[in-house]
Amino acid sequence: MILAAGFSSRMKAFKPLLPVGGKPMVQRCIDLFLDNGITDIVVVTGHYREHIEPVIRDAGACPVFHPGFASGMLGSIQQGIAKIRPGQTGFFLLPTDIPAIRPATVARMIKKFQSDPHRIIMPCFNDMPGHPPLIPCEFKDRILALKESSTLRDLMTAQKDRTVNLKFHDRGILMDADNQDGYRRVESKVRSLDIPDREECLSIVDQELPKKHPIRDHLAQVAMTALKLAHAVSGPVNVDLVIAAALLHDIRRMEKNHAAAGAELLQGLGFNRVAKVVGQHMNIALDPQAPVRETELVYFADKVCNGPHLDLNYHQRFRHCLEKMPWAANSIWKRYENTRHIQARIEACAGQSITDILAD
């Protein structure tokens, strides 16, 4: 159930029809559920219904008009719940001004609900609850019985023992387009949903690494170094992708073949482009005819960071590795040659030396 009945008074424009990522906000919310195989989608309308309802129908959902929409959100929720068909086991509840949620988030909530269909599934980011909750239909009558002075939040707060707080690395569950600033943030977020932002990367790091693990400092240094490289080179470099991949490149450092293990983790979270970069930060296939890309920048930044410190004398470190592990000479030599070639490519592209690029 999607709520789109309000006046959008703080926005000074009708939010559900504002464009987000090239489509109306309400359509993006509808697509979030259609992409997960949910076809029974109700959108509660009120203000501006004559304009929004055709958009809702064209997007594949069913508009339900709430005549008393001016009285507040609870009435709209009750109007939508009354339209839930018998036999349904649960429903999502999403205000239309929260459109920057990843489809993978909804998919995981569905999977959890299927194994535990009598509990409310509440998505959380950094321990903060967000949207959309997935509510068992057995709560339907209780919601319909709520008085006008009550809120759905009151009912759900009273059901803490029947609520599963499910952690996600998805800040979009907290982001609403309630005003112009919020709208701009949501618009920016939607443009790069397949790349975790800095807070989401740190959420992943917190899940995977102990608080004071030394790899954390290395990740931060590699990210800072890769960012400087990205700003120095010209061409089609996605800076957000560079930062995310750098912050996460050693996320599974303690595992055998940690690059592949890290890539597998990130693919499972829906971050395929980041996974591709992380998966190549140890062994990379170079194309000398192509522009310098994100994969090379993260690869090189990793090689010039010795633990938490920038150390441009990677030549000495590779020699030490050869002495320490002569049985791995072929792979070590290949990585060294790749590092040298990438340095030359970056310097040619930037028109300055690596020393100058990475100077404080």
Over which residues does each language-model region extend?
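Charged phosphate-binding loop/patch that engages nucleotide di/tri-phosphates or the phosphate backbone
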Residues: 173-176, 188, 328-360
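N-terminal glycine-rich phosphate-binding loop and ensuing alpha1 helix
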Residues: 1-46, 50
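Conserved beta-loop-beta/alpha segment of the NTase-like Rossmann-fold superfamily
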Residues: 70-141
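Conserved alpha/beta core of the MobA/IspD/sugar-nucleotide pyrophosphorylase nucleotidyltransferase superfamily
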Residues: 147-200
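Divalent metal-dependent catalytic cores for phosphoryl transfer on phosphate-bearing substrates
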Residues: 209, 230-327
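Active-site flanking loop/helix segments enriched in acidic
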Residues: 198-218, 223, 245-251
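Conserved donor nucleotide-binding strand/loop of the catalytic core
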Residues: 58-71
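A short, N-terminal amphipathic alpha-helix
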Residues: 25-40, 79-83, 225-232
